[in-house]
Design a protein with these regions (language model features):
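Short glycine-rich loop/turn motifs
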Residues: 44, 217-223
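RNase H-like two-metal-ion nuclease catalytic core shared by retroviral integrases
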Residues: 117, 292-316
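Acidic/histidine-rich, metal-coordinating catalytic segments
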Residues: 260-272
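C-terminal domain-tail junction helix/linker
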Residues: 317-379
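Active-site beta-loop-alpha junctions of metal-dependent nucleic acid enzymes
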Residues: 140-142, 235-257
Length: 379
């Protein structure tokens, strides 16, 4: 029986598409500057958008003057990124179709009364299907408004006990442990979802560390933010400040943002420079720069690191209410990150959230509800 072979990928278009389908092959320095990894394992090439079109430093483009696979890959990636940016609008999920037959010919059909909440029921006028949809809050005993109110109260500064008392005034009898369970469940749901959304962050990032208590022991929270939009990019908790390898923080930021910053601003911690050289530095120009702000005075980068200190202040205030964290892998810090990026408006951004400054619009009066519904629907 004759052997059959898979067809070879021969055209530049196919090779370019193959590059985009592999993770970590294209790194964006800015909107018009990219680095594409060599597919033969020999370093990388610079792809740049100019007034005369796209240019690449690879031999195929330099010698033949053709649109190489690296340019094609960047253009495909660029088009996809622009399409995603243009459509990153999260709206509240509204029931419009029957889950059985798909028709839009539905109408409300009474209320289902549970012990702690009421759920709207619907009927399909075509197939007769009766249904209720509670996206993101299925099998939950309490009203979604009570759950999201608890998250708003907690992340805006209230303790679990005070949140419990506030909910009681609203008619929701719930234990502080149940509230803690809600926070864990929905924080992880939202964080997993928003990490897949590509925020349009700037090209200057800042990293800093702050000490926190976990089970009474001193730990350090390392955080990475975008200077322009205040978007909190990444975080990690370390046992030590000076012995910690910050490469994990920078690597996570690079992976989530799908780019390398033009400038990284940090304090004088040596591990930052080591991590920068490992994760961000390249011989390909334009090279990313590491600015040690603590050594600079009267400098454009050294604004006393105020933008970073604001996040540190938020964490400090939150930690006082929590009286310390219980475990290193706590979801609370991730919840604070979601709250900071998507819920809390910032005066320095003219009342917008960092996510809105990055082109991600979360609509609806209850943004917690919108995020949870969209995250649940995307699973």
């Amino acid at each position: 029986m004759p052997q059959t072979f898979a067809p070879l990928t021969t055209t530049r278009e196919e090779r370019g598409k193959a590059i985009t389908e592999k993770k970590g092959q294209i790194w964006r320095y800015s909107n018009g500057m990219y680095r594409v990894m060599s597919q033969s394992g020999n370093g990388s090439y610079q792809v740049k958008k100019t007034d005369l079109g796209w240019k690449c430093t690879c031999p195929d483009h330099q010698i033949r003057g053709v649109e190489c696979k690296h340019i094609i890959a960047v253009k495909l990636s660029f088009a996809l990124r622009e399409e995603v940016r243009a459509n990153v609008t999260l709206d509240p999920v509204v029931i419009t179709n029957c889950p059985a037959c798909g028709t839009a010919n539905i109408q409300k059909f009474g209320i289902r009364h549970n012990k702690n909440t009421d759920i709207q029921r619907y009927i399909c006028l075509d197939c007769g299907k009766q249904f209720s949809i509670n996206i993101g809050f299925e099998k939950m005993k309490h009203n979604p408004k009570a759950i999201t109110a608890a998250m708003q109260l907690y992340f805006s500064g209230e303790s679990l006990r005070n949140t419990q008392r506030s909910l009681k005034l609203l008619g929701a009898e719930v234990s502080h442990q149940t509230i803690s369970n809600w926070i864990t469940k929905y924080t992880m749901l939202m964080k997993g979802y928003v990490d897949k959304i590509g925020p349009n962050v700037g090209d200057v990032w800042r990293a800093d560390e702050i000490y926190i208590k976990i089970k009474g022991n001193m730990k350090y929270l390392f955080a990475l933010i975008d200077d322009e939009t205040r978007y909190w990019i990444a975080q990690e908790v370390a046992d030590s400040k000076h012995m910690h390898d910050a490469a994990g923080l920078l690597h996570e930021g690079k992976q989530l943002m799908d780019k390398i910053p033009a400038v990284l601003v940090t304090d004088g911690l040596p591990s930052y420079h080591t991590a920068f050289n490992k994760e961000f530095y390249s011989n390909v120009k334009p090279q990313s720069r590491h600015i040690n702000a603590i050594k600079l005075t009267g400098n454009e980068w050294n604004e006393n690191n105020n933008k970073m200190e604001r996040i540190n202040g938020e964490i400090r205030d939150r930690e006082k209410t929590m009286r310390g964290l219980k475990k290193k892998s706590t979801s609370i810090l991730k919840g604070m990150q979601v709250y900071h990026n998507f819920i809390k408006p910032h005066e320095g951004l003219d009342g917008r959230t960092p996510a809105e400054a990055c082109g991600i619009q979360v609509n609806g009066e209850n943004k917690w509800m919108t995020l949870i519904q969209n995250a649940a629907q995307a699973k």
